[in-house]
């Protein structure tokens, strides 16, 4: 289809997004071209600008436009506490709680031997260096509670402990506002074991 090669290219480009299949990509492309060409231009410009301007923070690896992100530069943050998260989205979730006032280290992934993702790929060497700088007193492992997230937390925790760093892990438990009968058994078991 030479007369729709631009449309096909747009659909294929949209399919690169996580969770977007052919049908969703087509729907988005058709919407932008049929109903929101101005929005398509805004999206195109924002994407191009982000692709050239956004990079990784030299200290925590999150996304930033400067060499060091605003969180790392904030003198009000508690530099003795370092929270390790998998993604910038996880960091944003932690920030929305307003409960953590320390600094972060964003792995930009998690260990996954089956996918060829090892410690070097997620910056564990940088994390170990930063956590051993003499300023950090506690590293909070806030990786997800999936098999890969648990493996990542375990590997990092063991490496940090060998360096004499105090390591804690986010607690697991029953979500606030949930009814016990609807909570999965694994969550109940962990909540019971980790009770205080």
From Swiss-Prot:
Pfam families: RecR_C, RecR_HhH, RecR_ZnF, Toprim_4. GO terms for biological process: DNA recombination; DNA repair. The keyword ATP-binding does not apply. GO terms for molecular function: DNA binding; zinc ion binding. Keywords: DNA damage, DNA recombination, DNA repair, Metal-binding, Zinc, Zinc-finger. Residues 80-175 form the Toprim domain. The keyword Isomerase does not apply. Gene3D superfamilies: 3.40.1360.10, 6.10.250.240, RecR Domain 1 (1.10.8.420). InterPro entries: DNA_Rcmb_RecR, Rcmb_RecR, Rcmb_RecR_Znf, TOPRIM_dom, TOPRIM_RecR. SMART domains: TOPRIM. It comes from the Bacteria. A zinc finger (C4-type) spans 57-72. May play a role in DNA repair. It seems to be involved in an RecBC-independent recombinational process of DNA repair. It may act with RecF and RecO. Belongs to the RecR family. This is Recombination protein RecR. The lineage of its organism: Bacteria, Pseudomonadati, Pseudomonadota, Betaproteobacteria, Burkholderiales.
């Amino acid at each position: 289809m030479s007369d729709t090669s631009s449309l096909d290219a747009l659909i294929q480009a949209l399919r690169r997004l996580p969770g977007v299949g052919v049908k969703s990509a087509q729907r988005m492309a058709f919407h932008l071209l049929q109903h929101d060409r101005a929005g398509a231009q805004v999206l195109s410009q924002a994407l191009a600008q982000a692709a050239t301007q956004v990079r990784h923070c030299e200290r925590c690896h999150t996304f930033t436009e400067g060499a060091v992100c605003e969180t790392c530069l904030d003198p009000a943050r508690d530099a003795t506490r370092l929270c390790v998260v998998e993604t910038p989205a996880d960091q944003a979730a932690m920030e929305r709680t307003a409960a953590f006032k320390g600094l972060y280290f964003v792995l930009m992934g998690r260990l996954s031997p089956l996918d060829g993702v090892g410690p070097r790929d997620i910056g564990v060497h940088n994390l170990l260096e930063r956590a051993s700088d003499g300023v950090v007193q506690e590293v909070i492992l806030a990786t997800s509670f999936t098999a890969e997230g648990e493996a990542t937390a375990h590997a990092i925790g063991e490496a940090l402990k060998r360096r004499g760093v105090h390591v804690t892990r986010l607690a697991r438990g029953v979500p606030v506002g949930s009814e016990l009968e609807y909570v999965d058994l694994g969550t109940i078991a962990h909540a019971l074991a980790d009770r205080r």
